């Protein structure tokens, strides 16, 4: 087998099968032009989608000579790109909504960018099965960002046994030059979770350069300390069987005996290794899965490779400023984020689902120097303070509750972190303080109607509509228990006033996690009620009463044949029906983070609706997608607002010339990378790929591969060197691509 397969991005003009397919010409583009104001400040990234559990790195993403900020969010493995922009002497970040498309699709659990081969381009380290996977940065200013899978899994010599270099999926290791020889070594907690292992990169010693990733375990107790198994307490100068003191020449592995106690599964730790005191050896910041602080360990040595011991520990780091207390499982990241040439410290939690998720990026500004940093607390919401950000699973809803003719913005959520009871679901309120043509959303209240105090469970889902005939919208809430709450609008002026809740509204109970929408579905000029429920269907309650006295009667328990099926038994559909040019459409958000777009609804309420696009616009938002569609700025173009797992909102605008009633022939786009490749190739498409076949130039089938998404990585380790064709036989079109 030849480990090198040559890839060429060339789309052939021949098509094996003419599978002409017509799809709606319905395109939206990201647009952040509507301002959002909070506490008197205009937000810089209002529509950037939010942040939950961030890991930060830097990368010259666009090869323009400066470092851009790359954010990996452990909440469903999402990537955000903030490009470094320079205008005169002013430096700033600009959110790139499409930046994640140029990263490998299999980045999981963690992502760290660092230049392992000293070519001036940061490479990508992520999770491999039980360890570390590495992509080499093969891009340039001409071809753009490209990645080559360099190592599917890093290996290390464990005292004569060559095994996968173990790093728990929960952990963030320190990938850093420990010994000062310019190649990147790895510090990581052992599988027992109490000692830090030092895996030395032997590239420089073996080959005289840094472009290899060959590791040897040199120390099972680097720094000579132990972290307690039942807490995050640190024992310095550990005298246990794994640890020794004294010099370790060049270094050599200390004498190691098997621990008497049985190793326990490692729960989770984060490491940042930095020389804080310019002593020549690395110190540590350690985060633990069950705690909100960082332990700062200072190294008492002055020369690398001498097995120097950690001599002090500060559990209140930074003790000279506001000590970190960030629930839960904080990681620390060392990079310059304010463009002054000095690396700052960012901290963010990593316990998915149980950590702080609204004010979850603490920034400590470096007011010292590069060699002697001095970290001073600046904010607990770096980037987040400039976004719409409301925990996990944001849901955008518009309603004019101030009776001024301008739609206001409400953002519900699945839950937000709460220190006492851990989570709460609530609704934020942004008043529209602009005009019809130029809306401006101004933050008013993080907990509209104090709903978080009502103990309504997870994921309260609002919908507004006039149910009394007075022109003012009432509020209906869908609840976790499957029932609805009704809040009458009692306002007589410009301020929203809602009366006491009516529980179990009209006896409606859909089981669990009711997601209601008030909408005149049958065009009889009275509002009907569509309710999504946890398992994936929509229930249609027709208004058989009047506009001022509605009676909602169940007509269809599986409206349109819609049944949201995801990777779990739960669909969590969030229905949003809307009307454009007197035609009804539906977009459905769901647990899988994708959006389903339906048409053929009018005159077909008893039939199965047509699934026109899935996933709509190719968007994959991690989980809990939610949509709202309306022409908010009255420019005769629809706006699309998308809620998502990370607690913020994306805003998109209908493309000029794109018309929902028109159709055109659209071929899916298919791209391949890297070029060349040694092991795998990633296929990206604008449609779900389905079956992919690898053919040689004689037409012989070399490999069949099934992919149920728009992005797949195909292993080519058993493919001989040569030129190949990829045939995509999935709908809507067959295509041949030369490899």
State what each model feature region is.
Residues 1-28, 660-662, 700, 731, ...:
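Bacterial Sec-dependent N-terminal signal peptides
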Residues 24-660:
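Beta-propeller-forming repeat regions
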Residues 592, 685-690:
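Short proline/glycine-enriched turn/loop motifs at strand-loop junctions of beta-rich domains
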Residues 669, 701-719, 732-733:
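Glycine-centered tight-turn motifs at strand-turn-strand junctions
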Residues 694-702, 724:
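Short, glycine-anchored, charge-dense loop/turn motifs used at functional sites
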Residues 675-682:
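Short coil/turn motif common to extracellular beta-sandwich-like domains
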Residues 653-673, 686, 700:
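Residue-level detector of functionally pivotal "anchor" positions at catalytic/ligand-binding pockets or at interdomain
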Residues 721-739:
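C-terminal tail/sorting-segment detector
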């Amino acid at each position: 087998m030849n480990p090198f397969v040559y890839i060429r991005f060339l789309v052939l003009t021949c098509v094996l099968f003419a599978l002409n397919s017509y799809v709606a010409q319905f395109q939206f583009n990201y647009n952040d032009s509507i301002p959002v104001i909070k506490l008197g400040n205009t937000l810089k990234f209002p529509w950037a989608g939010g942040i939950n559990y961030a890991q930060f790195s830097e990368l010259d993403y666009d090869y323009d000579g400066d470092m851009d900020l790359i954010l990996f969010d452990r909440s469903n493995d999402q990537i955000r790109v903030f490009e470094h922009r320079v205008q005169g002497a002013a430096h700033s970040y600009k959110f790139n909504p499409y930046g994640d498309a140029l990263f490998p699709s299999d980045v999981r659990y963690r992502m760290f960018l660092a230049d392992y081969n000293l070519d001036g381009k940061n490479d990508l380290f992520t999770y491999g099965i039980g360890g570390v996977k590495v992509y080499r940065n093969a891009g340039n200013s001409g071809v753009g960002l490209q990645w080559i899978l360099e190592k599917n899994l890093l290996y290390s010599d464990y005292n004569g046994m060559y095994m996968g270099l173990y790093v728990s999926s929960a952990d963030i290791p320190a990938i850093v030059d420990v010994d000062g020889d310019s190649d990147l070594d790895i510090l990581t907690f052992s599988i027992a979770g109490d000692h830090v292992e030092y895996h030395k990169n032997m590239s420089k010693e073996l080959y005289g350069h840094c472009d290899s990733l060959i590791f040897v375990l040199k120390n099972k107790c680097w720094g000579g300390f132990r972290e307690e198994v039942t807490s995050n307490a640190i024992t310095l100068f550990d005298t246990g069987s794994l640890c020794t003191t004294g010099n370790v020449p060049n270094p050599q592995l200390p004498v190691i005996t098997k621990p008497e106690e049985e190793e326990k599964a490692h729960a989770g730790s984060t490491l940042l290794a930095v020389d804080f005191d310019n002593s020549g050896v690395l110190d540590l910041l350690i985060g633990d899965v069950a705690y909100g602080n960082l332990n700062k360990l200072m190294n008492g040595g002055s020369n690398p490779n001498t097995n120097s011991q950690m001599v002090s520990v500060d559990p209140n780091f930074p003790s000279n400023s506001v000590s970190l207390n960030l629930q839960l499982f904080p990681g620390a990241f060392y990079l310059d984020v304010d463009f002054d040439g000095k690396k700052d410290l960012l901290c963010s939690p990593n316990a998915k689902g149980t950590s702080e998720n609204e004010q979850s990026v603490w920034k400590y500004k470096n007011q010292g120097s590069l060699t002697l940093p001095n970290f001073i607390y600046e904010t607990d919401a770096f980037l987040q303070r400039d976004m719409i950000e409301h925990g996990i699973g944001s849901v955008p809803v518009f309603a004019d509750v101030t009776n001024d003719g301008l739609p206001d913005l409400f953002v519900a959520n699945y839950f937000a972190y709460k220190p006492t009871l851990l989570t709460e679901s609530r609704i934020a309120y942004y008043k529209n303080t602009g005009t019809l043509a130029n809306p401006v959303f101004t933050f008013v209240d993080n907990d509209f109607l104090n709903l978080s105090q009502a103990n309504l469970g997870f994921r309260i889902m609002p919908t507004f509509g006039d149910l009394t005939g007075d022109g003012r919208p009432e509020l209906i809430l869908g609840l976790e228990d499957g029932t609805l709450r009704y809040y009458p609008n009692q306002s007589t002026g410009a301020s929203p006033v809602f009366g006491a809740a009516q529980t179990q509204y009209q006896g409606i109970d859909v089981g669990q996690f009711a997601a209601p929408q008030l909408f005149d579905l049958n065009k009889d000029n009275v509002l009907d009620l569509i309710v999504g429920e946890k398992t994936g269907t929509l229930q249609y309650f027709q208004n058989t009463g009047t506009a001022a006295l509605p009676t909602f009667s169940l007509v269809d328990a599986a409206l349109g044949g819609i049944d949201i099926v995801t990777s779990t038994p739960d669909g969590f559909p969030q229905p949003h029906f809307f009307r454009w040019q007197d035609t009804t459409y539906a977009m459905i958000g769901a647990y899988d983070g994708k959006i389903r777009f339906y048409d053929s609804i009018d005159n077909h309420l008893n039939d199965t609706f047509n699934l026109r696009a899935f996933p709509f616009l190719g968007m994959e938002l991690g989980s809990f997608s939610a949509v709202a569609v309306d022409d908010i700025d009255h420019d005769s173009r629809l706006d699309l607002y998308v809620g998502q797992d990370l607690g913020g909102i994306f805003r998109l605008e209908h493309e000029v010339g794109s018309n929902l009633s028109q159709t055109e022939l659209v071929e899916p786009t298919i791209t391949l990378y890297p070029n060349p490749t040694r092991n795998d190739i990633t296929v990206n498409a604008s449609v779900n790929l389905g079956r992919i076949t690898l053919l040689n130039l004689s037409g012989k089938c070399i490999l069949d591969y099934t992919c149920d998404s728009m992005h797949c990585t195909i292993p080519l380790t058993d493919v001989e060197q040569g030129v190949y064709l990829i045939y995509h036989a999935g709908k809507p079109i067959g295509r041949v691509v030369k490899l």
